Amino acid sequence: MAFVLKKDPTFMWPVAVELADDGDYPPFTFKVRYRRMTQEYARDVATKLNDGIEVDLVAVAKEIIAGWDEIADDSGEEVKFTPKALDQLLKIPTMAAELVATWINATAKVKEKN
């Protein structure tokens, strides 16, 4: 199959997180539209994290996330992706770390297959 150079430099990827809720850690899943960043950017972020260098995960998440699906509010209504909604999501403890880790794993698997 031929590689198609797409104009849309993003990809959808499932995210699974476990967040404290009523004395348990139920799994929550949704889909995130990640930006395809340069190889250098991805390597820099991954290397810093692997080397224990502090990384502003909220700032990274804001750079790499372009949208989402399957996120709802308390009443079950779909939450549209906006910068303000992303800020709200990133205020949840551990969320930025989970989102960045998922992006790194998704891009690493692509590199492994090539």
Describe each region flagged by the PLM.
Residues 1-49:
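Short, charged/polar N-terminal "headpieces" of proteins
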Residues 24-28, 37-114:
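Short, surface-exposed, charged amphipathic helix/loop patches that serve as local interaction elements
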